[in-house]
């Protein structure tokens, strides 16, 4: 194919050369030119033949290489396939041998199973015969026992079951009692250890709160400027703040009196600013009081944020933080509620760590437990209920809401967290020195405790001790039995809960003693 193509190319080249030569002959008639052209044409034809032969040889060699390569590839592929087929044949042969072995094994097992089945059938037949014989013997013995005892089998079975049931109940009762006593002793010991550890690890600073504030004056002349002409300045200040200003003979001091600590703080800041500024008149007073109110609001917000930061509690709603800051200006039996909440939170966290429960959640519940005390008196309800509603409103979890609601038994505690908050609240409020009350209130509370205890029949005397946190009731052994002492203690506790208001809890101890006297003469 390639040789024919080269021949055609040479023919075309020769025709072209002839055409050129013809043109050349027509244009030039000179013999020399014709001879030169013929010679040139002959050379070109010769060169073309040589090139054609070279190309033909190269094409032949390439064709041989292609054929050789194709043959080599075919032989290699054939060899690979033959090797794969041999390997496959070997695997199939091995599988066939394995299948033969398994078939032989299955045949052996089948024979063994058949043999066992025949043996079991024979044993079953023997056991059936023995069972029939045993049932016959049992029936005969039952009849003989019924004749001897005069009871049927059902009656004897009933008596036996009742006896076993009574014994089981008695053993179970003893076991339950032992477990309860052990659990009570262990729980009491463990709870005391945890509370003692919590108290030792936390020692918060505390300063008793009062219902008055004192503002120092640079001189007694300032008192006249504070009062103003015809008392207009002092009236304007009292009207703007809602706090009474007491200006008496106390040197270089003005007393601010009021039960609302927030207003008292506003009045104190306002008066200090007015004294420092020197301009004291009704217009200036209103302006300064407005600025002081803004400063107190900002201080409350910062106090709430600082409390959350100190405890490591995050994600609290800004409104709740503001209410926590407001607790800084609330007191309970002269104990600052803000400091009390921080103390309860720290105690909750310590006890939660000892018990292995969520420390962050315990601190959060402790911090928010008295949230309801930050709300003014316009909102009705106990502070626990109000606090729980606020916590729920601002997205606190149900566990936190329940702990707030249950810390004063407005709801029965149902979680360990709620009981922890109760315990920490009692620890913070009931420790000596945490709370103060007026002497008259204190004495009246002791008298009421002793009066309630003595109002019950059979009580000979009562003594309020431990600052009114415990009462010992002496009873007549002739009128009150040992069994009645527990009932009497519960009745006294119930009456105290109904008729009295008190912080923490009160322990009632009923003491009954029998004295035998004889004289040796």
Swiss-Prot record:
Keywords: Cell membrane, Endonuclease, Hydrolase, Membrane, Nuclease, RNA-binding, Transmembrane, Transmembrane helix. InterPro entries: HD/PDEase_dom (IPR003607), HD_domain (IPR006674), HDIG_dom (IPR006675), KH_dom (IPR004087), KH_dom_type_1 (IPR004088), KH_dom_type_1_sf (IPR036612), Ribonuclease_Y (IPR017705), RNase_Y_N (IPR022711). It is found in: Cell membrane. Residues 211-271 form the KH domain. One of its GO terms (biological process) is mRNA catabolic process. It comes from the Bacteria. GO terms for cellular component: plasma membrane. Its EC number is 3.1.-.-. The keyword Glycosyltransferase does not apply. Its main location: membrane. One of its GO terms (molecular function) is RNA binding. The keyword Nuclease applies. Residues 337-430 form the HD domain. The chain crosses the membrane at residues 5-25. It is a single-pass membrane protein. Belongs to the RNase Y family. Endoribonuclease that initiates mRNA decay. This is Ribonuclease Y. It comes from Geotalea uraniireducens (strain Rf4).
